[in-house]
Amino acid sequence: MVNKPSLAKRIGYHESGHAIMAYLLHHPIEEIKVFVNKYSHYGYIITDPNLDGRPVSRCIKEGALISCAGNAAVYLLTGRKYWWRSSGDYVDVVGALSWLYGCKDEITAYIEFLWIQAKNLLSEPENWCAVEYLAGCIEGAQQEPGYWDEGEYYVHYDYEDTLQMDGFEVERIISREIEKYFSHEEGLSN
């Protein structure tokens, strides 16, 4: 069954999919930004991976996995597959492709493989709970009065763990909360 969540919910899950995958791959998250106006929306995350000593092949795979994770999270939420060849999420497709070189059919097959791998990683219960938690924070920020009015608004999680929205600042402890969440889960399993 296909679920049709609100745009705010899809945005939240999409960006949190990227962010949690980055966290799982040990790429520190510097910021998560969601930009919305009356006609369009987009979001992005910026990570600061410490790639020293990592093999190039691992860096390539991790970068492409993070790019695939946004659509994978939305799929897990909605049950709808966003095909890479026709996805409206063009930037993520380009992001994943930018890490890869080779013939078109091989790249398409590899991206499909990474998409499945991202979906499987995010669907693990503790990871999915973290996606839901962060998505709720992002979605909640979009519910602020005026957020969907005409004009340009954005949600911005920066390294200082502050949420800024159209001039308002609300404290949110995002990366710390994610880490606290995973520490709590590890404590429960011990």
How would you label these PLM feature ranges?
Residues 2-190:
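Soluble catalytic regions of large protease machineries
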